[in-house]
């Protein structure tokens, strides 16, 4: 039977000589070496690497290089497969069946960031401008930096907002079209800034009343007034009038550090170091209900507001998450929301259904003694360290963690849809994602993450 060789004659000869060299260097018996020479048809002079000026370690080097090349081929094939999957998903995600603007809320970022911003210090919070391609980054050195995402060679503006680290940012468009920015800090202060037309920060108010670290702030529009709520390590939540700078309400919802809050109308949800989440009526300070399941401090809470009963139904509303978590419920209309989400240092994210308080005419709402605890709807498990931030966009829930990963979850099924396993070289502190409002004329698809290594990853379509 004829033999078919893959290698040509000269390469076979080199391989045979290299095998003999390797066996000799390994100290094999002379009989084995002689047998190999006879098998390969080589003389003793041909197998002498020193005499022929041949590298005696050639076989070992070739073998190692083949392994490295094979590993590189596997990595490239995996990357090619990921890019192919993303490319195939673009038409359905971006345009859907009925054209662009219907399914854009289902967009998920690609595997690799479009570009990266470096601010040189730990990024503690990120916010997007509501209508312009501008990102505001807060750092642990007290700076706030504004970047134009389409011209990122230099920051638009940077200011030393606080003497110590900035803990959070909040943005709100004022009635006159200007942009208001709130910064909270470890220096016990909260400041309100105006981002002017010439891309500069102008200080409007300094709010000083907290006696410890100010953790987070949140704007609230109440009629013609614009209010700001803050929470602090001094155990209090305070509500401020942004025009006068007066504190109009202060109350204590927890007995430990209040780390996070979210407002909707007259109601506020807070999360604390005591591992509980509480619903309060802030004008009266009444505590209404609470959630007890987490075992470690709460890092972030989010309210999922209901759609107004008068809101027109769009094709995007056919999505299950719109029908379930955002649909109008007349019983909850005084509250304005039915569900909230929390994340904690116990590595868990929990979706909660909020019990209805007792609504009494001409009196503040009271706790419902028959149901004082939130109802657990779903627990999202997957992170292996503290979950630091969460954001909701359509039916997608995004989360970041100290395990250096970002995850995208389906709010309806609880399934983890996508994982960015090494999204950063350091702990990921914060996320920011553009609006998921279906009538948003911008239809932006932006996603940002900030980490302790001073990098901000920007994902865009």
Swiss-Prot record:
WD repeats lie at residues 118-157, 161-203, 209-252, 254-292, 318-362, 382-421, 423-461. Belongs to the WD repeat LIS1/nudF family. Transmembrane segments: none annotated. This is Nuclear distribution protein PAC1. The keyword Coiled coil applies. Signal peptide: none annotated. It is found in: Cytoplasm, Cytoskeleton; Cytoplasm, Cytoskeleton, Spindle pole. Keywords: Cell cycle, Cell division, Coiled coil, Cytoplasm, Cytoskeleton, Microtubule, Mitosis, Repeat, Transport, WD repeat. GO terms for molecular function: dynein complex binding; identical protein binding; microtubule plus-end binding. Residues 64-93 form a coiled coil. HAMAP family: lis1. Self-associates. Interacts with NDL1 and dynein. InterPro entries: Dynein_regulator_LIS1, LIS1_N, WD40/YVTN_repeat-like_dom_sf, WD40_repeat_CS, WD40_repeat_dom_sf, WD40_rpt. It comes from Eremothecium gossypii (strain ATCC 10895 / CBS 109.51 / FGSC 9923 / NRRL Y-1056). GO terms for biological process: cell division; establishment of mitotic spindle orientation; microtubule organizing center organization; microtubule sliding; nuclear migration; nuclear migration along microtubule; vesicle transport along microtubule. Positively regulates the activity of the minus-end directed microtubule motor protein dynein. Plays a central role in positioning the mitotic spindle at the bud neck during cell division. Targets cytoplasmic dynein to microtubule plus ends, thereby promoting dynein-mediated microtubule sliding along the bud cortex and consequently the movement of the mitotic spindle to the bud neck. SUPFAM superfamilies: Lissencephaly-1 protein (Lis-1, PAF-AH alpha) N-terminal domain (SSF109925), WD40 repeat-like (SSF50978). One of its GO terms (cellular component) is spindle pole.
């Amino acid at each position: 039977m004829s033999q078919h060789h893959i290698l040509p004659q000269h390469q076979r000869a080199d391989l045979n000589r290299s095998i003999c060299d390797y066996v000799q260097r390994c100290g094999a018996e002379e009989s084995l070496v002689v047998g190999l020479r006879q098998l390969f048809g080589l003389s003793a002079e041909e197998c002498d690497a020193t005499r022929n000026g041949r590298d005696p370690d050639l076989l070992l080097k070739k073998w190692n290089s083949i392994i490295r090349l094979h590993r590189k081929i596997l990595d490239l094939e995996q990357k090619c497969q990921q890019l192919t999957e993303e490319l195939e998903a673009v038409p359905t995600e971006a345009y859907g069946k009925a054209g662009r603007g219907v399914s854009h809320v289902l967009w998920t970022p690609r595997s690799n960031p479009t570009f990266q911003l470096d601010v040189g210090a730990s990024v503690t919070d990120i916010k997007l401008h509501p209508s312009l391609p501008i990102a505001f980054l807060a750092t642990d050195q007290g700076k706030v930096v504004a970047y134009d995402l389409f011209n990122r060679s230099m920051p638009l503006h940077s200011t030393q907002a606080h003497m110590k680290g900035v803990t959070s940012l909040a943005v709100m468009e004022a009635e006159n079209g200007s942009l208001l920015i709130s910064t909270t800090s470890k220096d016990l202060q909260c400041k309100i800034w105006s981002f002017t037309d010439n891309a500069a920060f102008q200080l409007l108010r300094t709010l000083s009343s907290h006696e410890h670290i100010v953790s987070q702030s949140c704007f609230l529009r109440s009629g013609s007034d614009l209010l700001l709520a803050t929470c602090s390590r001094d155990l209090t939540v305070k509500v401020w009038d942004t025009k006068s700078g007066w504190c109009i309400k202060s109350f204590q919802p927890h007995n430990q550090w209040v780390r996070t809050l979210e407002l909707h109308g007259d109601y506020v949800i807070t999360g604390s170091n005591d591992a509980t989440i509480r619903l309060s009526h802030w004008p009266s300070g009444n505590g209404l209900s609470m959630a007890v399941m987490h075992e470690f401090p709460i890092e972030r809470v989010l309210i999922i507001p209901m759609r107004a009963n008068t809101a027109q139904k769009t094709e995007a509303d056919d999505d299950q998450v719109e029908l379930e978590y955002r649909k109008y419920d007349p019983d909850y209309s005084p509250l304005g929301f039915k569900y909230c989400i929390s994340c904690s240092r116990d590595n868990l994210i929990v979706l909660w259904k909020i019990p209805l308080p007792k609504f009494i005419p001409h009196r503040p709402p009271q706790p419902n003694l028959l149901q004082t605890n939130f109802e657990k709807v779903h627990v999202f498990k997957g992170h292996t360290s503290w979950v630091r931030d969460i954001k909701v966009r359509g039916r997608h829930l995004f989360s970041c963690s100290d395990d250096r990963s970002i995850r995208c979850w389906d709010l309806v099924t609880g399934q983890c849809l996508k994982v960015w396993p090494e999204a950063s070289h350091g702990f990921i502190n914060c996320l920011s994602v553009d609006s998921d409002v279906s009538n948003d004329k911008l239809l932006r698809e932006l996603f940002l993450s900030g980490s302790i290594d001073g990098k901000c990853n920007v994902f865009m379509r």
